[in-house]
Each structure stands twice: as C-alpha cells, then as structure tokens.
Amino acid sequence: MEDFSTQLNVLLVDTFNSILRMEESMLKSAGGANLSIGEMHLLEAVGKGDPEGCTISSLARERSVTLPSVTVAVNKLVKKGYVEKQRCEEDSRSVRVRLTQQGRRAERMHSYFHEKMVEAVAKSLEEDEKSVLLKGIIKLNDFFSRKSVSQEA
C-alpha cells in the first residue's frame, strides 16, 4: 500500500484537477465559453466585494496576484462585458470595478455550480463522515492559508 504522503498528494492533485475540469465543463455548457477559470474566479472576487465596487489593489490582495496581472485581467473582462470600471470620486487615481448584469449572471451561475457540487458530495456522506471531512478540510485550509501568508512575507 502506498504511504500516506503519496496517497494524499495524488488525492489532492486529482481532486483539484477534477474540480477544475467540472468548472470548465460548466462554463462551456452554460454559455460562458469565453471565460477562463481564472477570469471566473476574478468575477467571484468582484462579486463578493463592496457593492460600490472593488479596487484593483483589493482584488490583487484577494486573489494573491500582482497589480499588473489584475489590471490586465480586469481590462479583458471589461472588453468581454462582464465588469465595468469607474474612477473613484474621492481619489481620481483609484478605480472601482463592478460586475455588469452579464457579470452578475456569470457569477450566479458559478455559485450555483458550487452549491450543486457541495450538495452532491454531502448527499453521499453519513453525518459522522461529514463532520470528519469538515474537520480535515478546515485543517487543510488553515495549513495552506498559513503557507500562503508566510510565503508572501
């Protein structure tokens, strides 16, 4: 039998890749074929932000990417019609990014996909298995969150 580390690595990679494939398939079948997974997750970050809009800086922090990368991605989403940019009245150097109606539709579709995915997983588990799974994933998430923060410092 494989050792724990090897088995865990295979499961993490396979699970991550399976979720990405499912998301890509969902995007294509729902008419969002012109969105990449990264763009979809950026829309999700914009949607979770301030209703008045998010700044490029806050999006970069949220997504753990550089300002230039977010700027390029936001500009692509503007061209595709998913977000709009507006200069801040208080600080003309700052830009706020908001979802358009098309962006809100795509973000709702993505949220619905995640709801259905979680429901399907939960349906196959007993209550004690759900509890164990949550505890394990919470620890896993805490570990990766700490690693992410320590690597940024």
Regions found by a protein language model. Name each.
Residues 33-36, 52, 69-72, 76, ...:
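Short glycine/proline-centered loop/turn elements that form peptide/ligand docking sites
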